[in-house]
Structures are given as structure tokens and as C-alpha cells.
Amino acid sequence: MTVQIENRDNGIQVVRLTGASASKSFSRESLPIIADAIDKGLKNSEIKGMVITGEGKFFSAGADINAFQESIEANEAPQLIRDLTNILHPLLMRIRESSTIVVAAINGAAAGGGLGLALACDARIASPKAKLAASYASIGLSPDGGTTWLLPRLVGEQRSRQFFFENQIWNAEESANAGAIDEVVNEDELINRSIEIAINWSQWGNHFREATKHLLHVQTLNDFETHLKH
């Protein structure tokens, strides 16, 4: 089983990516399973908060690089990218728009599309072993998974330029200092602290959570007068 689901008290669900779903999250095999597991939690009215985490060295390592290299050599990369983004991008939108509070408990590497998954969450808590990486430049592809939209909103445009164009890898402390991660906690505290935040943020009514997430989402897209009308 590549995704483990654990229901906790107070309407909190822990979604743990294991095995290939953590180390090669965005493959044709793993991504549909991940999306289905997260979607079921988002659609469940009894789940008010969700914690997404990984296993071992990986939170979510993004694409299967070998599969991408093979698709490039076979001139099939555009179709592979379409197949994956047709699942990933709607999933990220549902996370952003859902009334469910979603917390990323980043235990290890969040790379490529896995970085997009972490950035789309409402909060990001990390262990000292966490790493954030884009990892697109090395395979000649532009960043995906909404990372070029999400990261600048957290750390600023110029800091994001440095991150992408220098193909940087941020450790937990660097990520927190930049503003990409909210807190760094001891490894053995990661899940409990993430659950604590999910409980705290999800204690309010469904409409408040959904409307507030929506307003925060659109606040940079509209001028102030238009924003006041939402």
C-alpha cells in the first residue's frame, strides 16, 4: 500500500505517502493513488483538518526522473507531462479551495511536484531533515506544480528567482528563514505539532474556513475595491 490513512480525534486525518508514493510520487502509477486518497479526505464532511506527510528521506520527491528521461529520449515527454498535470493541478486547486485545513508535515525532501504539494497546503511544519528543491533545471524542464506561483507568495519574487535559476536546495532552517516553512520542530514532534495546528485552525465553522481560504487566495488577483466585494 503506497498511501496510509489514519483518522485521529477532532476530525483530523493523517495521509502518509509511503514507498514509491513518497520517493516517486508523480508517476503514472503513484499519482492517481495519492490524489484519490487526498480527495476522499477533502470530500469527507467529518474531516476538518488533514496532515500530509511522507516516509523516510522523502516527503514527496516529485517525478520519477528515470521515467522522465526515458520519455524525453522517446519524444513522449509532452504527453507524460499532460497526463501527470491533468491529475496534479486539479488536486492542488482542490486543496487550496477546500474548507479542510491541510498541513504539510515535511519529514524529508519535497522536490519538484512534491514541492508544489507542500506549498499548496495551508501550513508547512518541518523536521530538521526537511529539504525543499525545485530540481527542474537539471532535466531541462520548466517548474511545474504551481511552484512558480506559490513560492513567490511566501518568500517574494526575487528570492524565488534565486531558488529556481540557481537550482538551490534549501534545508529546513533556510526554508524557515525564507518564509517557505512555518516551523521547524524535532523529528519526533513533527506529526503531533502538525496535528495540533490542524486542530487549532479547523476549530472554526466550515463557512469561515472556506471563505477565508478563498479571500486569501484571491487577494493578490484583485484590486482592493474588487476584493472588498467578495
Regions found by a protein language model. Name each.
Residues V15, I33-I34, I52, D64, ...:
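Terminal peptide-recognition signature
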Residues A22, G54-P90, G140, D223:
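Glycine- (often His-adjacent) and acidic-residue-rich active-site loop
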Residues M1-E55:
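Conserved CoA-thioester-binding segment of acyl-CoA-metabolizing enzymes
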Residues M1-N10, N44, N167-E173, D188-H230:
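C-terminal alpha-helix plus adjacent terminal tail
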